[in-house]
């Protein structure tokens, strides 16, 4: 059996077209959705991510603002800029590209963003609200994964789901969203004693640790859905995920590729979160 591919590029295209329609409707009413992206330092990977986010905005009728600062920018100056953007009615989403230079406290920076403009969903107000199932914004990567399940009719209610990884950005919110959808969720991580014992029982596995081949074919239940959130490089320097794709695709029922799986969905959900913020702002102004 060869797994069916969950194509993140194709689903993204559909969702972005819907986002563009909503953006056009808002713009016609004088409320063009606006996203501000802040980059501090010259991390090459961060520069690529920021460029892709700005391009996605431009391609879909959003207003976008990119603030690029040297790595020497002080924490106080960064916080002052965030406070300015919090007050700017043209901006509906504020995103600070992580990681930040060591002298800047990323927790303090995220907490400075107004919760109603926290389109990454990282602010403690949104992270806490996710626990109750009522966040203003869901973190983009796990939100994108949930849209993939929805698009392919993958049943979550009663399913055994394993999330490998416990980060605040992917692992923890992914587990909460699966739990909210009725799955029985196990979170595994670097201290988990027997990872394979957990994954072999899982109907759904989400791998999100940033470690190549953490999930191999012998660890997967036949027919399971495997979502690969990892972004790594193989020995030849080629982009790969956390899953041994060649092996696992022969066992799984559904699988996401890397690249072209979860990655495009992350930026798409950033657009959706920004649209939702703009729609709330427009309704409040009406």
From Swiss-Prot:
- Which Pfam families would you find in this protein's record? THF_DHG_CYH (PF00763), THF_DHG_CYH_C (PF02882)
**Annotated EC:** 1.5.1.5, 3.5.4.9
Give a GO molecular function annotation for the protein.
methylenetetrahydrofolate dehydrogenase (NADP+) activity
- Lineage, opening ranks: Bacteria, Pseudomonadati, Pseudomonadota, Betaproteobacteria, Burkholderiales
- Family classification: Belongs to the tetrahydrofolate dehydrogenase/cyclohydrolase family.
Q: Which residues bind NADP(+)?
A: 165-167, 190
The protein's annotated pathway: One-carbon metabolism; tetrahydrofolate interconversion
Which HAMAP family does the record match to this protein? THF_DHG_CYH
Its GO biological process annotations read: L-histidine biosynthetic process; methionine biosynthetic process; purine nucleotide biosynthetic process; tetrahydrofolate interconversion
A single Gene Ontology CC annotation of this entry is: cytosol
Q: Which reaction does it catalyse?
A: (6R)-5,10-methylene-5,6,7,8-tetrahydrofolate + NADP(+) = (6R)-5,10-methenyltetrahydrofolate + NADPH; (6R)-5,10-methenyltetrahydrofolate + H2O = (6R)-10-formyltetrahydrofolate + H(+)
What keywords does the record list, in alphabetical order? Amino-acid biosynthesis, Histidine biosynthesis, Hydrolase, Methionine biosynthesis, Multifunctional enzyme, NADP, One-carbon metabolism, Oxidoreductase, Purine biosynthesis
UniProt name for this protein: Bifunctional protein FolD
Described function: Catalyzes the oxidation of 5,10-methylenetetrahydrofolate to 5,10-methenyltetrahydrofolate and then the hydrolysis of 5,10-methenyltetrahydrofolate to 10-formyltetrahydrofolate.
**Subunit structure, as described in the record:** Homodimer.
Q: Which PROSITE patterns match?
A: THF_DHG_CYH_1 (PS00766), THF_DHG_CYH_2 (PS00767)
Could you tell me which species this protein originates from?
Burkholderia orbicola (strain MC0-3)
The record's section on InterPro entries has: Aminoacid_DH-like_N_sf, NAD(P)-bd_dom_sf, THF_DH/CycHdrlase, THF_DH/CycHdrlase_cat_dom, THF_DH/CycHdrlase_CS, THF_DH/CycHdrlase_NAD-bd_dom
Q: Give the gene that encodes this protein.
A: folD
Q: Which domain of life is it from?
A: Bacteria
């Amino acid at each position: 059996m060869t797994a069916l591919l969950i194509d993140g590029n194709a689903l993204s295209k559909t969702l972005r077209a819907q986002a563009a329609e909503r953006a056009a409707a808002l713009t016609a009413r004088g409320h063009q959705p606006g996203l501000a992206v802040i980059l501090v330092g010259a991390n090459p990977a961060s520069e690529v991510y920021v460029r892709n986010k700005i391009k996605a905005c431009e391609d879909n009728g959003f207003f976008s603002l990119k603030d690029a600062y040297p790595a020497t920018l002080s924490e106080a100056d960064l916080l002052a800029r965030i406070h300015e953007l919090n007050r700017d009615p043209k901006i509906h989403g504020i995103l600070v590209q992580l990681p930040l230079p060591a002298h800047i406290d990323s927790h303090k920076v995220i907490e400075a963003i107004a919760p109603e403009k926290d389109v990454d969903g990282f602010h403690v107000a949104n992270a806490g609200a996710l626990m109750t199932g009522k966040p203003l914004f869901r973190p983009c990567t796990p939100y994108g994964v949930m849209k993939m399940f929805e698009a392919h009719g993958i049943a979550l209610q009663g399913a055994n789901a394993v999330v490998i990884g416990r980060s605040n950005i992917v692992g923890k919110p992914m587990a909460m969203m699966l739990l909210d959808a009725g799955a029985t969720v196990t979170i595994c991580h670097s201290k988990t004693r027997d990872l394979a014992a957990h994954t072999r029982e899982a109907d759904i596995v989400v791998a999100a640790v940033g470690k190549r081949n953490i999930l191999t074919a012998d660890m997967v239940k036949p027919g399971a859905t495997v979502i690969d959130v990892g972004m790594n490089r193989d020995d030849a320097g080629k982009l790969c995920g956390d899953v041994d794709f060649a092996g696992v695709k022969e066992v799984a029922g559904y699988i996401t590729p890397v690249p072209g799986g979860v990655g495009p969905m992350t930026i798409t959900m950033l657009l959706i979160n920004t649209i939702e913020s703009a729609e709330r702002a427009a309704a409040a102004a009406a």
